[in-house]
């Protein structure tokens, strides 16, 4: 059926066949080429990190993958199977219904976590504004983990950030801390440590769906678990009372505990990409 093969003779049938074969082959090659190009482009953006998040999530210790409802006691021992995206969880609504009416103790262990904000497990917060934009910042524990950074690298205005992809990076003492984005959207303004927030984002969907972020009674339960996790990560460098039971947190943790392995502690706490 192909030129060059013994017994091949040109005919109308051969011409039609080869034309169709060429069109199919061209379509396949074009499709594969586009897929490779898109994949290559994605790996040069934070989209690649967002796509890799599910694999990264499975590598986290079980203590870091606890379901938000396990923390509140509604689903004891449950490990999250949706990489912290409760919007895709078929049981989230069921467990959330059990928590209706639960009173928030308000316990924040000496940390500042305003009720007007939603909180991400990677230690960022999100706050809504009347103009439909969202501001994103480091939560109080995140700020203390970072301490006095040497520099911050922000995405340019107009850049797109993807949930669990890279939001911004901070450098200190030769270490690079990578902060995950808590929401999908376009960066419309950048801030920094001196402004108390880092990104202003126009979310991809309106109204913004923040169902995967923590609020209310969940925040105190999660904070206790995070402080216990931090205590373990800092041992044996840490001394004094348990962080979740009255131990004071310095505003600059790396500065107050210089002998701790911060190149291990910060990536673990920030769920780094």
What positions do the PLM features span?
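Contiguous, well-folded functional domains in the mature portion of proteins
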Residues: 2-273
